[in-house]
Amino acid sequence: MDNLSLAKKSIFFKKLSPLDFNAILRCLNIRIKAFKSNEIIEYEGNPAKNAYLVLSGNLRTAFFDVNGTAIPIKDYSHDMFFGLEYIDPNISFYQEELYATEDSIVLIADLNKLFTPCENRCPRHQAIIKECIMELARTSNSSKKRISELGQQKTKDKILKYLSNTISFL
């Protein structure tokens, strides 16, 4: 299956007609790129200019401590967006590294074009903005649930869970 077919089947584009899909690709200046396993996509401190939609494979965000040890934050699998939260103008740089944990195909969208409707306020662009906002809401709810679960765990359980995630990450 070619990369455009993968993108068309994504939750963000499957409601668009083929004509609208091609138009939105041009409107948003979307690119599709393949990344190899362990290839770094964005470094911490890079200007936050793009959002990344996983079409296949898996991406991970991580912090790296002073010893170079990776501390995993979140995995992104099929139909998950990384970078939508950087639409906030107060956050102009990526705060973590993004890399592929396996061979991956990723759709890259310019953040400014993604959230700024085109001059003629086309309905297809409004549909994409709506999907992005829904994705932000899903992410927010998922984070709230995770924080709530962590708040209910004992410190011992948190440490064991963290260590098991770190060991499986290595």
Regions found by a protein language model. Give the residues of each.
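Short histidine-centered beta-strand/loop micro-motifs
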Residues: 40-46, 63-64, 85-87, 97, ...
